[in-house]
């Protein structure tokens, strides 16, 4: 047993194990770093998309406000509709 330790086989095995651990560690670091950079790119794209959607919503609000009909015409039509709604409610039996 003492001959195996002194012959250098043990140091060679130790060197091989440390090299394997180093290669596995570098591979893990590569994939974690790659995933992190892709996640950062996706976050940047999502933030840009959010900014564009906010601008589109603001533009849509302005367009809707510009195309909105005058409010004086609405109360006249709204006053006649509740009578029809009341007739329908009277026909439906309560449970």
From Swiss-Prot:
Entries under InterPro entries matching the protein: YebO (IPR025594)
Which segments carry the region annotation Disordered?
A: 66-87
Q: Which domain of life is it from?
A: Bacteria
Q: How does it sit in the membrane?
A: Single-pass membrane protein
Q: What is its main location?
A: membrane
What's any one GO cellular component for it?
plasma membrane
Subcellular localization is given as: Cell membrane
Keywords assigned by UniProt? Cell membrane, Membrane, Transmembrane, Transmembrane helix
Which residue ranges traverse the bilayer?
12-32
Protein name, entry field: Uncharacterized protein YebO
Species whose genome carries this gene: Salmonella typhimurium (strain LT2 / SGSC1412 / ATCC 700720)
| Gene name linked to the record | yebO
